Amino acid sequence: MKLKNLYIENIRSYKKLDFTFEDGVTVISGVNGSGKSSLLEACFMGLFGSKILSKDFVLADMIFKGAESAKIHLGFEHLGREYLIEQAFRYSLKSENASNSRCVLFADGENIVDQATRTYEEVCALLNMDEEAYRNCAYIRQGEIDVLINAKPRDRQRMIDDLLQLGKLEEYRERAGYAKTAVRRLERDAKNSFLGVKAEIEGIESTEPVAAVNRLRQKVKETDAILEELNKKKEFAAARKGELDLRIAEYRERLQEIEVLKQAIRKSQEDKAACFKEKETFSEEVQVQRRVLLELGEENSGMREECGFGDLEIEALLLQQEKSESSAREKVNSGSKELALLLKEEETGVQALRELEKDKVETERVLVECRTSIGAANKEIEGYRANIKQLEEENKRLREKAGFGAAGEIASVIKELEEKESLLRDRKNEVSTKLGFALKEKESGDASLRELDSEMQSCRVAVSKGKSEIEALEKEIRDNSKAVLDFQEQKSEVFAGLKALGFTEEQLENLEDFNELLLENKNRLHGKEKELEVTLREIENTLRKNRELLAEGKCPTCGQELKGSGIACTAEECEEKKEKLSLELADIKLQRAELEKKLNRLKEAKKLEKQAYDYDIEIEKLLEKAKASEKLIDTHRTRIEEDSLKLESSGKRKQELEAAGSKLLLDIKALREQEKAAQKVHLESEKALREAKVFERKLAENASEIESLNGKIRTSLALIENYGQRLGELNEKLKAFAEKETQSKEKLEALELTLETARKNEEEAKKAHIESARLLGEAKKLQANLLRMQNIKHKISEFEAGIGNLAEKIGFFDREIVERSDRIRQLEGKLEGNRLEELQQKLARFEEAQVNITEKIREITAEKDTLLKEIGMIENSLKRLKELKEELKALENKRLYLEAVYNNADELENTYMRVRADMRARNIGALSILLNEMFSFMYTNNAYSHIELDPEYNLTVYRKDGTPLEPKLLSGGERAIFNLVLRCAIYRLLALGFGGDRPDGLPPMILDEPTVFLDRGHVRQLLKLIDMMRSIGVGQIIVVSHDESLIDSADHVFQVEKDPLTNMSSITKI
């Protein structure tokens, strides 16, 4: 595999980068933090996606800060095909989380996978390794220089087995073990099912089902014969019953017809009687109507004579009377209208007369009011003039009392008083301000004295408390010293116990390493013990089979004698191998027992070491506590000194404040006396000013009142003049009202005469209309009587026709009665006396017989159904018996098959175990050779002879004198060399094909800062190591380093730089 191209956007410190990889050795250099390792991480992430991230490093950390999306496009060549992986990521600023938004794998330009998980699986399948195996084989990350060294043997075994594809064999062995367990479970279930089926078969056969079925079938045949005979009897009874039913039905029909005929005769007779009755009613009604007709004729003749209608036809008479009534009604209406107009005119005149009288009264009232208002105005004028005279006299008295002459003198005096009052007020305010400042200063001094007293009291309390704290802390220090001595004695006892167990104080630091080594040895012995036990079981099985064959003497296949053959020799070799393995197994068990004792001793030593550690912690805590107490004592003493100095300065300050306060008291007393005198003078000035202003205000008010009264007098004189004009107008108006009243009264008298004449005319017209209306009503009544006479005549003719129809009906009913009576006699002649009862008795006997036969058939049928049900159950049992026998045979075959499968799975599991152990041994041997070869090539110091890699992947370094040493106990530089050698050895082993891969299918080697712990000599050896890896077929080697020698020897060199302003990295080829 070779990397071809890397295109990234917004990954770590790279905003955008398009980088092409070259064959050979490529060195990437740059200052710390420039983004070299980020470039390798981008390649790693391009291959395996987010699977490379650890728990402390999330996907969002890979995206450039502030970016919302990122891309990685990685192109590579593998086994002759061109591949391209496109990864895209999306970052949410809101949730601050990132996710994979696109993951596509192209092969030779064709899209083969387009989902993150599937792409990851496809890449793992292509490379035959996942991200962890890639790190352990080809990618040595910065900070993971000794991962394989520090790993536990079990983890190291898993890592290397996965790289060499041995983990598949372990997986297959586990699958075979699971299959064996499952087959054993199925075999047990099949055996239980076999026993259950067998027990069920025996239970069914014990009931003799075939004989029982034959007996029941014979009983069914007998029951069928009885049912056939009963069904014949039932059919005969049913036939006889049917005949009787028909005869009885016919008899009943005839009886029913006779009854119907009799009812019809009775109905005809009733209808005939009803017709006779109705005929008589019609005859009586004809006589009544004829009497009414005669009365109406006589009434019409009387009306004609009374009203003078003569022999005129009723229509002409009605027309004449209607015209007369209409003419009279029109005369009444015209008279009523004329009368209404006259009445309305009279009402209008009366209303106008009333309005004139009302206006006259109102005018007279206004006239009286005007005369009254003129008198009142004259009285007000006299009052106003009296008030003016009184106010003028009051003003004169006020001026004489105050000693003022003109109004100008009053204003000048008030101005002088105001200026004097202002000067006195300013003086009073000045004295009050000085007094306020003095009082405030006195209050501030008193507050300062109180604060000083409080502060001095706090200092005294703090000094007392500090001395108490110092005494308590000194006592605590003495107690801590005593406790430290006690813990040191207990610690000495613990070290004595450790010495008794054989551990020195210097060995306590390595107890965990000893414990881990012992546990690893224990696990290794346990695994070896299990392998030996499996091998011993296989040998015993082989011996048992060989002994059985030897006991028979001949080969069961070819018949050849087995004595002295290869089987006999193999049996002897197996016996010897068994004895040897048994001794080895016993030796391993002894070693395990010895390890258990060592582990117990180590466990006790760890307990004691923990106690000693706890005592050290307690002693350290007590010493720290003592130091803290001493610091507190020093602090308290310093504070006591500070508080004492503070007390002294506060005392001096208090004396100064008290002296200043005494002086202020004298000043305040003098200022209060000055303030009192100023207030007295100011009050007298204010009083004089107020009295002057009162005089001035009173004079001004009186002048204003006089002016107001003069205005009112002028107003009253104007009102009197207006009222005089109004009186003239009202007198003229009263004269006009008198003339209008006289004219209205004359007009009303003329209307009264006209109204009397109109009322007489209306009364005469009404009388004439009443008479014409009466005659019209008589004519209409005559018309109604004539119409009623016509209706009566029509009714009489209808009644006479009805009487004829009823006579015909009566003849029809007589004929009907005769015909039905003849039919009844014929039907009664066909009946045979009282034979119906006899037929009914026979029918009852046949019905009873039919019911009995049916009940017996039902009972026998139920018995037959029971027999058939039993037969069905037994037949089901026979069918079940057949099925169970087939199932029993199948279960037997299944059990034998599962037993064979179990044996095959057991043999397969053992085979996988042997193959894995064999392949692991071969790989370990090859890896050990390569490891020592490269270690001797790489390591320039001659302090170590070789490295041992045991079957459990435990690594041990041996010194020249043969002393073994754990790799983790090597120095940092030695561990770095050891790690490089181990990684390169694994890579070489994979290149040789032990893992099943072709050499050109391996990924490029990537070394991130491999020279961190190496000196100059080992750096030169690293260059040779890189050349060696190139010689075995590694097409690409990518190194991140600052070392100049690596840079000089590289085929391609790139420089990575980061812009400090934008924090973005860039790469250039050198």
Swiss-Prot record:
Domain spans labelled Zinc-hook: 508-607
Record InterPro entries: P-loop_NTPase, Rad50/SbcC_AAA, Rad50_ATPase_archaeal, Zn_hook_RAD50
Keyword ATP-binding: yes
Cofactor note: Binds 1 zinc ion per homodimer.
Binding sites annotated in the UniProt record for Zn(2+): C555, C558
GO biological process terms on file: double-strand break repair
Top-rank taxon, per record: Archaea
Coiled-coil stretches: 227-257, 369-403, 449-478, 570-614, 878-908
Molecular function terms from GO: ATP binding; ATP hydrolysis activity; zinc ion binding
Binding site for ATP: 12, 32-38, 142, 969-974
Keywords: ATP-binding, Coiled coil, DNA damage, DNA repair, Hydrolase, Metal-binding, Nucleotide-binding, Zinc
Cofactor(s), by name: Zn(2+)
Keyword Iron-sulfur annotated: no
A UniProt-annotated Pfam family: AAA_23
NCBIfam families: PRK02224.1
Domain description: The two conserved Cys that bind zinc constitute the zinc-hook, which separates the large intramolecular coiled coil regions. The 2 Cys residues coordinate one molecule of zinc with the help of the 2 Cys residues of the zinc-hook of another Rad50 molecule, thereby forming a V-shaped homodimer.
Subunit structure, as described in the record: Homodimer. Forms a heterotetramer composed of two Mre11 subunits and two Rad50 subunits.
Database matches in HAMAP family: RAD50
Biological function: Part of the Rad50/Mre11 complex, which is involved in the early steps of DNA double-strand break (DSB) repair. The complex may facilitate opening of the processed DNA ends to aid in the recruitment of HerA and NurA. Rad50 controls the balance between DNA end bridging and DNA resection via ATP-dependent structural rearrangements of the Rad50/Mre11 complex.
Similarity annotation: Belongs to the SMC family. RAD50 subfamily.
Protein name (Swiss-Prot/TrEMBL): DNA double-strand break repair Rad50 ATPase
Species of origin: Methanosarcina mazei (strain ATCC BAA-159 / DSM 3647 / Goe1 / Go1 / JCM 11833 / OCM 88) (Methanosarcina frisia)
Lineage of origin: Archaea, Methanobacteriati, Methanobacteriota, Stenosarchaea group, Methanomicrobia
